[in-house]
Regions:
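Short boundary segments that mark the start of a structured unit
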Residues: 87-212
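C-terminal subregion of chymotrypsin/trypsin-like serine protease catalytic domains
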Residues: 2-14, 18-90
Length: 212
């Protein structure tokens, strides 16, 4: 099928197919087990005695014609749309809360504000940094949900938020802390020769007294 023609294996009905399931037009197109785009349409052209297929085996749901839409073409729209769904995000750097009450049910978001100072040489350049949470006295999976990734600050933006979810519990315990490390800046730098920035957040216990 198409994957065999271009030398790319993925997930799908056959060993060289990019679709999750047969006839999955509009679904995810996968390469190396990762979503690489959207399968806009697929088809198997045939007529009379001609059934064009790369190997003549029934190992795919499509033949040699396919069209994929790259997800990355809409990455800015995806990122910015998701950010609008953040619950109660801070409207300014001064409004960022450095402490968060853990509560007893569900999760509560806490935010980190990443600010771009100065100016872009090219206004169309995307600035990015990598980020990763790190345990302090708070433990990932127990007190907060670990997160890592790449944060992009798009043209006409001067900041972006990283959201981390705090896990509720009803255990009396001391206040706890965890960290967010920001590193590997692209199209910008931290200044003064710095290679990493770190911020801390405190999870405030609301479950009674703790003696330790």
């Amino acid at each position: 099928a198409l994957g065999a023609l271009v030398g790319i294996n993925g997930l799908g009905l056959g060993s060289s197919e990019g679709l999750i399931s047969k006839g999955d037009s509009g679904g995810p197109a996968c390469i190396d087990s990762l979503v690489a785009g959207i399968a806009s349409y697929t088809s198997r052209p045939s007529g009379l005695d001609a059934v064009p297929d790369i190997n003549g085996l029934s190992d795919s749901s499509f033949g040699e014609i396919a069209a994929w839409q790259r997800v990355s073409a809409y990455q800015q729209w995806i990122d910015q749309s998701l950010r609008t769904l953040y619950p109660n995000p801070p409207a300014s750097q001064a409004a960022v809360q450095k402490t968060v009450v853990e509560t007893n049910v569900g999760t509560t978001p806490v935010y980190f504000w990443v600010q771009l100072n100065g100016y872009r040489i090219d206004p169309n350049i995307i600035v990015s940094v990598d980020y990763k949470t790190r345990n302090g006295t708070a433990l990932s999976g127990q007190d907060y949900i670990a997160t890592q990734g790449t944060l992009k600050i798009y043209p006409n933006e001067d900041h972006a938020l990283v959201a981390v979810e705090i896990i509720a519990d009803n255990l009396p315990e001391a206040d706890e802390t965890f960290y967010l490390d920001v590193f590997n800046p692209i199209n910008a730098n931290f200044g003064n020769g710095l290679v990493q920035l770190t911020a801390v957040r405190t999870i405030v216990n609301d479950d009674g007294w703790f003696w330790g």
